[in-house]
Amino acid sequence: MASQCPVKNSWPELVGTNGDIAAGIIQTENANVKAIVVKEGLPITQDLNFNRVRVFVDENRVVTQVPAIG
């Protein structure tokens, strides 16, 4: 019986890192998603998108929340 390697869907290790670098790491580790850097507090759509990872950053572009698919 063959086992499948699960696709990575969240990146808790990136909290506290630079958002632009985090977005690059996410797209390298999961080529099926587009990582989008978003300043914390800006309005966002509430739709669920399995091809998107939002990387929330503060005013210093530091990741403030766990990036995850959605």
Swiss-Prot record:
Keywords in UniProt for this one? Acetylation, Disulfide bond, Glutathionylation, Protease inhibitor, Serine protease inhibitor
Describe the family membership recorded for this protein in Swiss-Prot or TrEMBL.
Belongs to the protease inhibitor I13 (potato type I serine protease inhibitor) family.
Q: Which residues carry this modification: S-glutathionyl cysteine?
A: C5
Pfam families, sorted: potato_inhibit (PF00280)
Q: Name one GO molecular function term.
A: serine-type endopeptidase inhibitor activity
What task does this protein carry out?
Answer: Inhibitor of serine proteases, strongly inhibits subtilisin A and weakly inhibits trypsin. Does not inhibit chymotrypsin, papain, pepsin, pronase E, protease type XIII and thermolysin. HPI-1 inhibits subtilisin A with an Ki of 0.21 nM. HPI-2a inhibits subtilisin A with an Ki of 0.08 nM. HPI-2b inhibits subtilisin A with an Ki of 0.1 nM.
Coiled-coil boundaries = none
How does it get modified after it is made?
Occurs in 3 forms that differ in the modification of Cys-5, HPI-1 forms a homodimer through a disulfide bond, HPI-2a is modified by glutathionylation, and HPI-2b is covalently modified by addition of an unidentified adduct but not by a disulfide linkage.
Q: Which GO terms describe its biological process?
A: response to wounding
The organism that produces this protein has a lineage beginning with: Eukaryota, Viridiplantae, Streptophyta, Embryophyta, Tracheophyta
Residues modified to N-acetylalanine: A2
Q: What is this protein called?
A: Protease inhibitor HPI
The record, for PROSITE patterns, names: POTATO_INHIBITOR (PS00285)
* Quaternary structure (record): Monomer and homodimer; disulfide-linked.
Q: Which organism is it from?
A: Hevea brasiliensis (Para rubber tree)
Site annotated as Reactive bond: where?
Q46, D47
